[in-house]
């Protein structure tokens, strides 16, 4: 896979490839085009049971399916397969788990649509299983409401350097593409200017917003943030946490829509005292999702 993608090999063969799998009969890894060997990853499934894998591997195929698989191959290949099936229950391998998990029609389309992005620096990126199932859990949370009509939120804990910013981009893409959340706006809150700039660049590079949208998304002052919250229609807003202190003093800084998702970066260190209170006052029914690299 990696060798054939090189410039002097057959890189054009991979131009339309979304997921790449490397298997050897027992094990399997996945990645996408241009992924360095050290970043090829194992997949750990959370929605398919081991019993399902076993049933699928040991289900006998009807004759028409066997013909499609083996008629163009030497007869001994078909005989070997039939001998394996007749020999008793086959043991499920990591290769089996990878193939069933990622190449189901619904999962493959989901991975392509929601969990693949292009980054100007890192290239094409496909989500790790932790990101996929973490985002799925978040989506389940934010599509539910509490007794006051506010969306439920949650916390995502990432180890340092494991792709927290990309998880935020994947989540934002899901909010854009999923019909049930298509009306939602996203407010990205950080506590440092350099983090705000970094996240804005990552969102733009990852396709969650255009360069023009990036400029409009920045809450450059507390007054600008108040206008964006109360009167704006930007799909994504970026703000430093302390701008809420100024914004909340302005009458337009209020929006009680439940269709606002607040993503708080470094949530472990910025949500004490008045910081969180000001956000809750401005956006009382929003879903609040904290991201942190600090163990909880």
PLM regions: where:
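ATP-dependent helicase/translocase motor core
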Residues: 1-185, 194, 198-210, 233, ...
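Conserved motor-coupling elements within RecA-like helicase/translocase cores
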Residues: 220-237, 253-254
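A short beta-strand-to-loop transition that corresponds to the Sensor-1 phosphate-sensing loop
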Residues: 24-26, 192, 239-243, 266, ...
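Short loop/turn elements that form and flank the Walker-type P-loop nucleotide-binding site
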Residues: 150, 182-183, 231-234, 256-258, ...
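Hydrophobic positions in the central parallel beta-sheet of the AAA+
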Residues: 188, 237-239, 262
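Signature of the SF2 helicase/ATPase Hel1-core->accessory helical subdomain module
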Residues: 2-3, 32-33, 40-43, 245-251, ...
């Amino acid at each position: 896979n990696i060798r054939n993608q090189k410039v002097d090999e057959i890189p054009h063969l991979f131009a339309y490839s979304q997921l790449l799998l490397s298997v050897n009969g027992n094990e399997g890894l996945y990645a996408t085009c241009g992924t360095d060997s050290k970043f090829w990853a194992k997949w750990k499934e959370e929605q398919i049971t081991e019993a399902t894998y076993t049933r699928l591997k040991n289900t006998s195929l009807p004759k028409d399916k066997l013909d499609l698989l083996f008629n163009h191959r030497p007869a001994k290949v078909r005989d070997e397969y039939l001998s394996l099936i007749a020999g008793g229950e086959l043991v499920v391998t990591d290769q089996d788990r990878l193939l069933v998990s990622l190449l189901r029609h619904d999962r493959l389309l989901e991975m392509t649509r929601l969990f693949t992005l292009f980054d100007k620096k890192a290239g094409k990126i496909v989500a790790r299983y932790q990101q996929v199932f973490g985002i799925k859990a978040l989506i389940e949370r934010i599509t539910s409401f509490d007794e006051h009509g506010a969306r439920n939120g949650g916390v995502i804990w990432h180890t340092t350097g494991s792709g927290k910013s990309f998880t935020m981009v994947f989540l934002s893409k899901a909010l854009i593409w999923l019909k049930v959340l298509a009306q939602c706006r996203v407010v990205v809150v950080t506590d440092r200017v350099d983090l705000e700039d970094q996240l804005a660049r990552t969102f733009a590079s990852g396709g969650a917003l255009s360069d023009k949208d990036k400029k409009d998304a920045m809450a450059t002052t507390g007054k600008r943030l108040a206008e964006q919250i109360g009167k704006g229609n930007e799909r994504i807003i970026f703000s430093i946490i302390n701008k809420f202190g100024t914004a909340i003093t302005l009458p337009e800084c209020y929006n009680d829509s439940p269709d606002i998702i607040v993503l708080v970066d470094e949530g472990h260190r910025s949500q004490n005292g008045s910081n969180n209170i000001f956000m809750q006052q401005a956006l009382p029914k929003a879903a609040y999702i904290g991201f942190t690299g600090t163990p909880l």
